[in-house]
């Protein structure tokens, strides 16, 4: 029987008014049953009415359910009021911390600027923040906010555009309160008082934490643990959404970082990202994004560990048989593997995770899940803090529980492939390569460097190679849209680290060509710039080692492959040049036409690559003099073997002042008042001394041997203090670990000026940057003998 028209209209209007009241009603003191459907529902149940106290299986956690129009749940304002005793304005309550008149900005005030803040009397106690209509006795209470350890306070900050007042925001579980005051001191006083009250509260525990404690207490009884999982779906795999985090996260409306939502909302988003892994075609980028979120927000790391333990437990408890048969379920184990190689879980979460892995191994000993569990348990014992999240290549290797291959370039020995994992350090890779190349008994020290063209930087021994590879991947992604260049692309290389000892090198080993190629690379970069006669002698020795004896028909490399580029001449101030007469311009145009100039430039550009020794000797001009001198020195080396030429090259290069010195840009901080602003300098670390010079100059302004360094210590994150005699020098540089390693290597190297028994203290935790000593005076040249002296005549 159809309803009468009037009754039908009344029912529709009533439903419409209900919706309007929900959407546009008083949002501060009223609510609807559906309004808080995203909040979690926690229940503490007892197995029997006669039970006294909480037993190990008494806690039951259920997911929220959507309630109908008529709900037995408390409305949001009723829930808030039910926690506060009904009483009027307290007169002399000893629990009152601070009270006074403040303005309260209405909810959504930023979106509704036409609503002005309302003035009210606020009272802060040890339990709540209460709002009253007035300060008199019997005033009506307008609202209360229960304060717990999860509440947060932000501010004070001045809202110039909205109200012009100083505001302090207190965030609770259901809503937030923004208190405003025209005076900054008043806002700061309330902010400090609110933070002190919140800090004095005992930490809250979620029901999930209580369940973890029960599982830990019942770990010796598998049946009890299985019963806990059976009665609490929150611990098991689910395909539904998670409406609240598993761990206590602070309430708050402000984002913890750019591009992020509040922590509790980000925790729910993480769970959605985990569920998206099951059907992702390319899970690597999604996994990397989840790991990056945990790196940016450390508070979510334990939360994600628990979510992964939940999703790897199976729908029927740990471990679920459907999870072992579903290939998509392996994605959770793969992400858990990456997490265990990147972050360290907290104490309680770590214990629960280890127990979960052990139960998986015992239940499915020969399955792939057991292999993942064993791999994760080993990784948790070795993982320490990482600077960057794993690269896509590392994520792919970890998903298969395999090692990652990295390529290290060794001068004179080609490229070496080294198998690493997420915990391998640069020092371990350097030691493996030193042993593989037969350099274990060498007097020279070697280290791993990152290199790109002429740029290079030593890696500290404790640096994780996986972090370096991730940085290379990020830099390559940033430069993907840029034009490719010959020097684009970072790589790892093994290099000499410290002073060079060319004596006693075996002609049949890898060390001689290794040092030979590295010394030549340093000379091509102008580190150091030796005299011209030494450069020509070195070029002749390199030709002898590469081409053997001189022959006029041997194709030669270009001069820029043998000699460093000439130093740019100093620019003199421009002088006005007289304007030539028109006749001179006409004559120049007739003798030097643009077409002739173009042809001569093209001929000069082609001239270097395909020239032979005979053609170079017949050329004239400025560059031909250097080429002729190089060829003359090469002719005098007839009969010298390749190994002998390389050894002579190293011996001559080691005699150059400042050979192998490292250069770093530093900032000098004056220790005396009134000395002005800090100045930029170059710190040079040589084999015998360290020096300071101005950028672009070759002569040092300060030079001191290591034996005269009285103290060398770290004064800050990037500040180094050097004390020589009565003077102290403060230098600032970001390359702390590199300089610390290099200076310690030089201090450990015995020298006539600083014997092994020298009492100069080693550098401890010092940060430094050193410039290549491109100036004489860092090391004094030693005498030359044999064929080395003949080459420079």
Curated annotation (Swiss-Prot):
The protein's name: Pleckstrin homology domain-containing family H member 3
Biased composition (Basic residues): 598-608
In-chain residues carrying the UniProt-annotated modification Omega-N-methylarginine: 638, 642
Residue numbers spanned by region Disordered: 28-62, 554-586, 598-622, 750-793
Domain MyTH4: 237-399
PH domain mapped to chain residues: 95-199
Low complexity composition-biased segments: 750-762
Polar residues bias: start-end ranges: 782-793
CDD domains to which the protein is assigned, alphabetical: PH3_MyoX-like
Signal peptide boundaries: 1-18
Residues of the FERM domain: 404-754
PTM annotation (Phosphoserine): residues: 30
Biased composition (Acidic residues): 29-41
GO CC list: cytoskeleton; extracellular space
Keywords: Methylation, Phosphoprotein, Signal
Gene3D superfamilies for the chain: 1.20.80.10, MyTH4 domain, Phosphatidylinositol 3-kinase Catalytic Subunit, Chain A, domain 1, Pleckstrin-homology domain (PH domain)/Phosphotyrosine-binding domain (PTB)
Family matches, as InterPro entries: Actin_motor_Myosin, Band_41_domain, FERM/acyl-CoA-bd_prot_sf, FERM_2, FERM_central, FERM_domain, MyTH4_dom, MyTH4_dom_sf
Provenance organism: Homo sapiens (Human)
